[in-house]
Structure formats: structure tokens, C-alpha cells
């Protein structure tokens, strides 16, 4: 999407991939790089660029994030400073009224979570001159800024209490936090976000991320089809902010 040789936005870019610890594929657990080490590697590589590469931008696209997993729905919320419990939040629809996004069949539930050390590492990369694109997520949640009325909303479940409208690490206010534009327009002159895209004041930009055709593995678990130009390769139609983020990364 970002750097494809035929349709990519940055066709002359060089691609480097990292396998991160905890994000490995099936059968290769324990083979990824620790996240802090991966970020240090990127920063060190960026700072050491010389010659013809010295003036080339470093753009990092990240499509992963932290969540807290819990099997139960909240017993209490604090929504914009007001306590909610009991019959206030005893249905999924009522929870969503207070911007806690739980949907039928989604147990175990996953709520976005921030990790301060990871966010600090992101800021260090940005301070070094690296451009960061982060896919905002597909969890329906509102992601608010520190000054917003939803930033301090909390939920309480059996494993503890957490914030639910602060988004997911890796995050920085100085990064590009990318939401997903739907493939169906709102009107003849306006686009609209996809319904499950994370949204809100902390989402900086939206890019096309629905019904995106891109390359995939010939042994992938998606519903791939033969690449139209060469049947030895595969392509797939897929949706999510993971498809939107690379659009921005490629433009940068």
C-alpha cells in the first residue's frame, strides 16, 4: 500500500521490516525483537544515515497496539466525572451510550491500554526526526486528548480499573494517528469514517482503509486470490486502520 512498485505512493522507498516480540506469527513465538530494542534500532539506524541516504526521510508505520483483556463487562464506569453503575450500565447499549464499546459475541473483551514507556520511546524517535504513523484501531472507541471531557473516563472490571478513552500505545500527540475512511461515501461530496474505526480528537487524519486491495502471502490465512498480473502471487481485499495507516506513511 505504502511503497508498492505499481500502485504504491512511495515507489522509490526502501522497506525494512521488524518482527516484534509478542506479535509473531503462528509457530514462531519467542523470535521477535523486544519493543524497546526495536525502537532503539530504528533510532540508531536513522541517526547513522549518511551519503545519499542522509537526506531521505525515515517513516515508521505501526499497526499494532496494547489492550487489556477481560472476560466480564464493567460493574462501574466513571463517565465525564459522573459515576455509573447498576441499571445505568446493565445493557450493552447503555455501556455504549457512555462510550464503552462492548458488542455481542466480543468476549473476552479488549479495552485500549496505554504503556508510558512505549509512548516515551515513540516520542524519542519523533524527537530524532523520524515520522511515525500509527493505525488508530478498529475497536469503535473514542480516543480523546488530555484536555478532553472523555480522557479520564474509567471502567471497573474484576481485574481492576482502567481508562477506556485514552487510545492504545504506541501513541504520541506528535505522531500521525490514522483512522479509516469507509468505501461507502456519506454523500456525493463527503466521505465518512468506517463505523468500527477508532475516532475522536486524538485521531489526526483519516485515510482510505476499507476494501483495500494489496499483496498477501501465498500461504496466508486470508481469502487471497491470484494477483491479476502474475498468478504466482496473491492479492487480498481487506479493511481496517491497518490499511489506512500505510496510505499516510507512503504520502509522507
Sequence positions of predicted segments:
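Peri-catalytic substrate-binding/gating loops that frame the active-site cleft of hydrolases
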Residues: 1, 5-7, 11-27, 75-76, ...
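Subtilisin-like serine protease catalytic core
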Residues: 1-37, 50-59, 68-73, 127, ...
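Sec-exported extracytoplasmic/periplasmic mature domains
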Residues: 3-7, 40-48, 65, 123-130, ...
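Alpha-helix termini
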Residues: 7, 41-55, 113, 120-124, ...
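Structural recognition of the beta-strand scaffold that forms the well-ordered cores
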Residues: 9, 14-19, 56-64, 131-135, ...
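Acidic glycine-/aspartate-rich tracts in secreted/extracellular proteins
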Residues: 21-23, 65, 139-140, 182-185, ...
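Short acidic, glycine-rich surface-loop motifs adjacent to enzyme active sites
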Residues: 43-113, 135
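Extracellular S/T/G-rich loop segment that most often corresponds to the catalytic His/Ser-adjacent loop
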Residues: 155-252
Amino acid at each position: 500500500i505504502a511503497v508498492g512498485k505499481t500502485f504504491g505512493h512511495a515507489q522509490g522507498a526502501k522497506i525494512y521490516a521488524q518482527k516484534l516480540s509478542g506479535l509473531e506469527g503462528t509457530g514462531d513465538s519467542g523470535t521477535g525483537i523486544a519493543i524497546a530494542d526495536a525502537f532503539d534500532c530504528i533510532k540508531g539506524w536513522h541517526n547513522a544515515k549518511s551519503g545519499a541516504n542522509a537526506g531521505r526521510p525515515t517513516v515508521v508505520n505501526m499497526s499494532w497496539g496494547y489492550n487489556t483483556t477481560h472476560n466480564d463487562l464493567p460493574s462501574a464506569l466513571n463517565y465525564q466525572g459522573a459515576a455509573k453503575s447498576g441499571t445505568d450500565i446493565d445493557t450493552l447499549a447503555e455501556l455504549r451510550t457512555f462510550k464503552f464499546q462492548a458488542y455481542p459475541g466480543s468476549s473476552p473483551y479488549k479495552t485500549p491500554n496505554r504503556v508510558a514507556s512505549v509512548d516515551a520511546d515513540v516520542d524519542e524517535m519523533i524527537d530524532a526526526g523520524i515520522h511515525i504513523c500509527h493505525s488508530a484501531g478498529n475497536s469503535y472507541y473514542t480516543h480523546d486528548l488530555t484536555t478532553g471531557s472523555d480522557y479520564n473516563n474509567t471502567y471497573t472490571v474484576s481485574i481492576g480499573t482502567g481508562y477506556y478513552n485514552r487510545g492504545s500505545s504506541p501513541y504520541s500527540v506528535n505522531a500521525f494517528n490514522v483512522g479509516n475512511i469507509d468505501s461507502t461515501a456519506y454523500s456525493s461530496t463527503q466521505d465518512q469514517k468506517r463505523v468500527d474505526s477508532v475516532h475522536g480528537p486524538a485521531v489526526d487524519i483519516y485515510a482510505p482503509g476499507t476494501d483495500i486491495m494489496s499483496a498477501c502471502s501465498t500461504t496466508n490465512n486470508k481469502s487471497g486470490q491470484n494477483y491479476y498480473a502474475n498468478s504466482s502471487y496473491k492479492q487480498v481485499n481487506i479493511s481496517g486502520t491497518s490499511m489506512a495507516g500505510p496510505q499516510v506513511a507512503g504520502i509522507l
